[in-house]
C-alpha cells in the first residue's frame, strides 16, 4: 500500500507542469487498469486519484507561496499544470478557504525577505 502511494505521488509530482496529465496516464505508470487504480487508491487513501492529485498540487502551491516569492500566482498555476490562474485560485480557495494572494500576504515570511523589505 505504501509503495502504491509513493509511486503514485512520485508520478503525479513529476507531471505537475503537464496540463495534459490525466488518470489514464497515471494508471499506465502504475501498471494498472484505470478502474482498478481508482478502486485501489480510494481504498488506500480515502481519496479518488483526482482528489489526491489536486491535494498534492495544492500542497505544492502552498509551499511555493510561502517559500518562493519570486513566482507570481500565474506562474505557480502554470507550474502546477492548471489551465488558468483563475481556475487555480478557485481550487486553492475551495481547499484552503482563502485566495492564494491573500494567503501569501498573510503567511509568515522568511527573515531574509522581511529584512529586504525593511531596507527598501
Where are these regions (language model features)?
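A sequence-composition feature that detects small, non-aromatic residues
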Residues: 8-9, 27, 61, 99, ...
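Membrane-proximal linker segments that couple transmembrane helices to downstream signaling/catalytic modules
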Residues: 1-31, 36, 40-43, 118-119
Amino acid at each position: 500500500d505504501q509503495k502504491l502511494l509513493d509511486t503514485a505521488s512520485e508520478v503525479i509530482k513529476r507531471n505537475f507542469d503537464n496540463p495534459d496529465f490525466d488518470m489514464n496516464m497515471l494508471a499506465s505508470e502504475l501498471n494498472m487498469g484505470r478502474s482498478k487504480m481508482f478502486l485501489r487508491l480510494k481504498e488506500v487513501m480515502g481519496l479518488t486519484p483526482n482528489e489526491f492529485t489536486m491535494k498534492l498540487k495544492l500542497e505544492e502551491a502552498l509551499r511555493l507561496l510561502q517559500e518562493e516569492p519570486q513566482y507570481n500566482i500565474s506562474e505557480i498555476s502554470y507550474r502546477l499544470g492548471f489551465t488558468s490562474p483563475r481556475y487555480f485560485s478557485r481550487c486553492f480557495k475551495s481547499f484552503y478557504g482563502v485566495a492564494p494572494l491573500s494567503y501569501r500576504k498573510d503567511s509568515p515570511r522568511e527573515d531574509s525577505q522581511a529584512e529586504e523589505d525593511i531596507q527598501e
